[in-house]
Amino acid sequence: ADTICDLEVTEPIHATPIDPPTMSITISVNSSPLAGTEGKKLTSTQIKDRLITEAQNNVGITFSQNANVDSFVISGRGELMLEILLTQMRREGFEMTVSPPKVLYQQDENGNKLEPIEEITVDLDEEFSSKIIDSMNRRKGKLLDLKDTGKDKKRLIFHAPTRGLMGYTSRFLTLTKGTGVINRIFHGFGKFEGEMDGRKNGALIS
């Protein structure tokens, strides 16, 4: 990036680091007998050209083509980013099959498994605090802060693995009866927190 400044200023402004991808999906050409009923752009070439354009304009998206030339692995920063891309493509007339999302893991210098961790900020009515804390604990979330923000209002801050948050927004809205507000940002990669309880309901991103 370029820094525009006074001639006497010689130190450039450092670029803001880009968060790494934390989740991936695989999209494939729809080969079912019903192909073409919901869209007109069906071929792997059309899908690839669209993904190339997306990767050029969206620094948060990367993709690779599988050995099976009819499928592509798309990586992005969370389920919302991937959901937006899929929605845009379908509105543009693309038809494809989509795999369930997968979390992207890393390893540290000692070979230990690391997973993406998010910071979650929740604003809600006090009466729902215990339900949200319990639901986050089930997802390996750790409560960092709890404070009053007004009459009968609370703000909770958690760190939780990305894999535990897939599909959580709808669950959160149910638990808070639609009154809570949840914000998520990437925090970093941390120690793998172990297996979680089985999911009661499935999670779809598109």
Language-model features, listed with the residues they occupy:
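Accessory interaction regions appended to the cores of large information-processing enzymes
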Residues: 1-206
